[in-house]
Amino acid sequence: MDGHDFEYFCAEVLKRNGFSRVNVTVASGDYGIDITACQGATSYAIQCKRYHGSVGNKAVQEALSGKVYYGCKAAAVLTNSYFTPQAKETAHKTGVELWDRDKLTAMVKKAYPGQIWIPKQKKAKPKQKP
């Protein structure tokens, strides 16, 4: 699944988790926002990141600026991975919500009960000296 497919997958998962007015933004000129959606009365600007490594501070900053551009009440970064300490600190200070691999897994399980198995992310073993 490439990044574009991941955005559409996340949009469907959000719909199945009770979000309404879920829209995938156009690829260019999206101001870092991949999905806009509402949960109750709260409108969200959401950036999706399909990464192998940790998601950094830049994604949080882009979600925050995209929130302002789209006039949303909240911003979130949704990833199949985890976040760096710097990203967590910035999110805490700015109010951007961080939805990591564990949150995404829970949302997928709720969206597709009993249908999908998601493997645990394997941690790389440190290289041993010869």
Label the predicted regions:
Residues M1-P130:
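Mixed-charge (Asp/Glu-Lys/Arg
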